[in-house]
Amino acid sequence: MAKRMPAKVAKKAAAKPTLLSGGNPQIAKGDGDAPVQAYIAAMPDWKRDVGRHLDALIVRTVPGVRKAVKWNSPFYGVEDQGGWFLAFHCFTKYVKVTFFRGTSLRSLPSGESKLKEVRYLDIREDEPLDEAQLTAWVKQASLLPGWRT
């Protein structure tokens, strides 16, 4: 006969998100700020600070930004643009920021994609982040037509 866990221990174990490949949190899909904050809280180590910083920068730069978690990643969009302009995802050594219409940004983000319009920015623990450039990309991306899921 299997041993049962006490209810408090079982509830605590169930509440802790699973980390997928590369340390990406497995968070149930959902709309709004709550699932995005759950994702950020579950990001491992230094990546959690990056997630908080990205979220705050996006909220500050794009008033009224729309948020959701889809495919275990936070997505950001603007209602009038009809879709998503940005998402991010944890990998082992970096946090990847995806600009869905990245090839339309002035001064392209460095990461290329197999997808025609997508560009990436990889944020690594020991590399400086150009805050002014990131803010400019977020602002520009939010004004472009959104990517539809």
Question: Could you say what each language-model-derived stretch is?
Answer:
Residues 2-149:
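Charge-dense, helix-prone N-terminal extensions
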